[in-house]
């Protein structure tokens, strides 16, 4: 439905009150995903629901992996809004026990390998990096407003290579999640974060610009970020 709506010029997909179960959702240009009050989207804890691998960035290194519960690549004018909840799978799902790589990411990935060959999809014994909750990459004009993120598998809100991002009035609850960062901005430009409440067991806010040799290769800083009126 999202792709069809985008091809028609855009619009709003409304998730009504109730509990909904989903694998990865991909936002497309000119589409708003709005969660009504009382709507809960619980995302899958199965590796197969995050296939095929998509272009993403894990801990500052470009890979092909799970991406995020809600993902976008190369989209413009996208929004995730409303008073509903984005929720990860139950705390006892096997995916939560997967090692998030064999070691730190720079020891897992051969930087000489083309990015399209850096496959981290959890298949055939390959590394699996758990999906973030919301991670648009290479997007322009991104709005995240009002929603609550709970029980993440990894970082919650992680724009990458994005321009003109507004994150307003969101709530993050991830105190029991290892590496359950709140809002991580990675190589983005023109970002406003305001009126948000973050309760995290790891970093509440981070500003990133790539890691080690891969970060130097990409050479994209994070710039012009304003964080104000938040509780963390």
Language-model features: locations:
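Extracellular/periplasmic carbohydrate-active domains that bind, remodel
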Residues: 1-232
């Amino acid at each position: 439905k999202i792709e069809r709506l985008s091809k028609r010029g855009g619009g709003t997909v409304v998730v009504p009150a109730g509990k909904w179960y989903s694998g990865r959702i991909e936002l497309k240009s000119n589409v708003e995903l709005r969660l009504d009050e009382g709507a809960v989207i619980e995302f899958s804890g199965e590796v197969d629901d995050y296939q095929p691998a998509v272009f993403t960035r894990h801990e500052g290194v470009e890979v092909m992996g799970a991406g995020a519960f809600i993902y976008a690549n190369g989209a413009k004018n996208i929004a995730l809004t409303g008073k509903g909840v984005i929720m990860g799978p139950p705390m006892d799902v096997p995916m939560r026990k997967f090692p998030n790589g064999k070691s730190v990411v720079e020891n897992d990935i051969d930087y000489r390998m083309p990015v399209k060959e850096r496959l981290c999809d959890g298949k055939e014994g390959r590394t699996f990096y758990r999906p973030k909750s919301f991670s648009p990459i290479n997007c322009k004009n991104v709005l995240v407003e009002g929603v609550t993120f709970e029980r993440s598998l990894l970082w919650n809100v992680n724009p990458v290579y994005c321009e003109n991002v507004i994150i307003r009035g969101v709530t993050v609850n991830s105190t029991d999640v290892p590496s359950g960062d709140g809002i991580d901005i990675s190589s983005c430009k023109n970002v406003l974060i305001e009126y948000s409440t973050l309760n995290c067991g790891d970093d509440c806010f981070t500003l990133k610009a790539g890691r080690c040799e891969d970060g130097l290769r990409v050479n994209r800083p994070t710039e012009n970020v304003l964080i104000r009126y938040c509780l963390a």
